[in-house]
Amino acid sequence: MVYVVYIGKESTAGAAWELLDREGATAVTMRRLAKSVGITPMALYRHFEDRDGLLNTLADVGFEELAARAGGTAMPADAEQQLMKILDVFLDFALEKPRLFELMFLERREGARQFPEDFREGRSPTAKFVAAALERGMKEGSFRKDDVWEITFET
């Protein structure tokens, strides 16, 4: 008797999360992922265009989670303290999920947002928090006036 089992995008993404968390982005290959969920590598291409698409999906979910944390954090009134609070949220996330943070911010990924265009156009769900705190501080005189996005990526 032959059984057909449908492995959905959620199960493959879950297995990809486990690989990423245990071994880092270099371990997340289509072949290893397929083997871990019991399907052929070609079957994964129904859910993800390629390995870059898979890694970008994982990174995007991470950015959404980090943005939700930053957006859900009570912020102090002082711009300098607000910036420190946002950076604390980023640091806590990095310590809690180091491999994901590395994928999000340190790994070169095909299709990742490009500086400065994508950031100036508001396409980053996380950088906007740092930029907003810096801009506020510049307007209030807490920080010297400068290019907000250049400073955001130096922070």
Where do the language-model regions lie?
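Hydrophobic alpha-helical connector segments
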Residues: 71-100, 149-152
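Amphipathic alpha-helical packing segments from all-alpha helical-bundle domains
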Residues: 114-140, 149-153
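Amphipathic alpha-helical segments used for helix-helix packing
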Residues: 95-114
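Generic hydrophobic, amphipathic alpha-helix propensity
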Residues: 8-16, 33, 58-66, 70, ...
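Short, intrinsically disordered or compositionally biased N-terminal tails of bacterial proteins
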Residues: 1-6
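Helix-turn-helix
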Residues: 11, 15, 19-53, 57
